[in-house]
Every structure is written in structure tokens, then in C-alpha cells.
């Protein structure tokens, strides 16, 4: 679409009934790359499909959650779980798999959710790592016993370092964005369910964390009101010149867009749609938000639309 929201072209790409699109990016050649639970699809600048890759190794599907193109020209997709592990897959520009690496897996359901390139041209990945509960080293209700998981790798997938942040219950990271002055902001969710996992529908909160270049927690904030969905988190964060903004779904009020600028009170709005599948800072200083039901919202810098 153009900058006014008018459709320039549209196309559809089949990844089967369980495709469940999770990420789309514009590539260096002006085309687009789409990633979902069953694979990835590359299209040209006019939306014409160029190639598709649905290969997998562990599990029924590759379960991609995010994809990026590195400055080296290669594509990197992350996701999981496959046999309990998270994965990082490196593709060349024609869609062939060059490297597939697996991480975690001590307990079931380790997942990578988001990937970005670091200033030193490595990869930084965030997601969720499963741990035990009060009775077992690996909890049976594994989706409710998680830590925020941050992994830095080289471009071949070799681990530089990894960190986890969390307590005895549930903390997850879903998206990460760089800060201009250094470090990163990430968004996730937190539920102190006190071993009553059914209470997360009322107790789930948005978790915002600032980390440094080594993944250390510098600051965090939790905001109540998040609508909790068990398997498909749909919240996203973007940074601005002097702050950040995020989008999620409020449990009572639809799409929830929230902006933080230092030394001012936070501003937020509730609007139509289901959640903040993706939020990006636009060149005019505003924001564009994609929701889970396909609604696209464009705001100005003050969240007016």
C-alpha cells in the first residue's frame, strides 16, 4: 500500500492450512520475505512469488516466528519449538538452507520470538526458555513456567553469550528493538500466577525491559491490563529518537498503543483490531501498527489517527 493506506497490489501465498503468518520484511532488493509456522516465502517488489522453503528438521513444521535480512545479504529465521528446542536458520538469497542450529531443550517448549542485527554485525535473539515449578525440574504445564531468554550469536549461529531473566512463574520476551544510544528495549509478558495457571487471564501484564549490549537488565516495568493468549503472543515494540512505543491487546479495549518519552507522562490509546502484531516508527515521526485481524492503523507522533 502507499503512504495513505491505498492498496497498490495484493497477492496470496500458500503455506497450507497451518501457515499462520508471523513476520514480513522488505528485502534489500525491494522485494518482501514472509515467514510463518510452515515456512518462508520470497516475493519480488510487485508481490510475485519467487521462491518458497518449507523444509524442517525436528517437529511437524519449522514454526518460524521472525525473519530478518542481515547486512551480509543472507536471511535468518528463528522460531521453535522443535523437539523442545528453539532454532536459528540461515538462508541464502535463493532460499537454500545454509545452516540450521538448535538451542536450549533442557525442558520442553524453548522458543525464539524475535531477531535483529547488532552494531557489531552479529545476531541478537529473544524469546522464552522453560523451567520447572515447585515440584519438578521441568514443569508439565510448560507454557506457564518460562524465563525471558536472550541469546547473542555469530552469523554462523555460534553462541557468544546467553542470559535469562525471570522468577519462579512466567516471563516471556516477544520483540526487541535497538536504542540509538546503545542497548535495547524488549517487550514481553509476565504472570505471577502463584502456581494457579488459570489466573493468567486476569494477572497477565505487559513487561518492558531495557538491557545493555551484554543482555543485562538495566530497568523494567510491568503494566497491567494485557489480554493473555496461550500460544500466540501479539505485541511489538519500536524505538524512537527519544523514547519507545509498543502495541498489544488490552483485555477489555482492543488494540492498545502506548508511547513513552523521557520526562513526560506516558500516552496511550485504545483502538480497533486485535493486538499489536507489529509496530514501526514511520519517517514522518508517527507509527504504523498491524493487528492480528489484518487491520492497519497509522498514527501521528502523538498517537492521533
Show which residues each predicted segment covers.
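A sequence-level/structural motif corresponding to short, flexible coil/turn segments enriched
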Residues: 1-305
Amino acid at each position: 500500500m502507499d503512504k495513505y493506506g491505498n492498496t497498490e497490489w495484493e497477492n496470496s501465498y500458500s503455506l497450507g492450512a497451518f501457515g499462520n503468518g508471523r513476520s514480513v520484511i522488505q528485502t534489500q532488493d525491494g522485494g518482501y520475505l514472509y515467514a510463518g509456522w510452515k515456512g518462508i516465502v520470497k516475493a519480488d517488489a510487485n508481490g510475485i512469488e519467487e521462491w518458497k522453503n518449507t523444509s524442517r528438521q525436528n517437529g511437524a513444521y519449522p514454526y518460524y516466528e521472525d525473519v530478518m535480512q542481515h547486512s551480509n545479504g543472507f536471511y535468518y529465521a528463528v522460531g521453535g519449538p522443535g523437539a523442545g528446542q528453539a532454532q536459528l536458520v540461515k538462508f541464502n538469497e535463493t532460499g537454500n538452507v545454509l545452516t540450521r542450529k538448535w538451542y536450549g531443550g533442557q525442558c520442553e517448549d524453548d522458543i525464539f520470538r524475535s531477531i535483529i542485527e547488532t552494531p557489531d554485525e552479529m545476531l541478537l535473539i529473544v524469546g522464552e526458555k522453560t523451567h520447572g515449578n515447585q515440584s519438578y525440574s521441568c514443569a508439565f504445564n510448560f507454557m506457564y513456567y518460562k524465563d525471558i531468554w536472550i541469546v547473542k550469536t555469530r552469523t554462523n549461529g555460534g553462541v557468544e553469550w546467553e542470559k535469562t531473566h525471570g522468577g519462579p512463574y512466567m516471563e516471556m520476551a516477544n520483540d526487541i528493538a535497538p536504542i540509538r544510544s546503545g542497548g535495547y528495549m524488549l517487550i514481553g509478558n509476565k504472570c505471577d500466577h502463584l502456581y494457579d495457571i488459570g489466573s493468567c487471564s486476569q494477572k497477565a501484564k505487559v513487561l518492558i525491559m531495557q538491557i545493555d549490549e551484554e543482555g543485562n537488565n538495566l530497568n523494567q516495568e510491568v503494566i497491567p491490563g494485557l489480554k493473555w493468549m496461550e500460544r500466540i503472543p501479539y505485541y511489538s515494540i519500536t524505538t524512537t529518537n527519544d523514547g519507545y512505543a509498543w502495541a498489544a491487546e488490552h483485555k477489555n479495549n482492543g488494540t492498545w498503543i502506548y508511547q513513552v518519552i523521557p520526562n513526560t507522562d506516558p500516552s496511550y490509546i485504545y483502538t480497533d483490531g486485535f493486538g499489536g502484531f507489529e509496530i514501526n516508527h514511520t519517517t514522518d515521526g508517527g507509527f504504523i501498527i498491524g493487528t492480528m485481524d489484518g487491520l492497519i492503523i497509522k498514527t501521528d507522533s502523538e498517537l492521533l489517527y
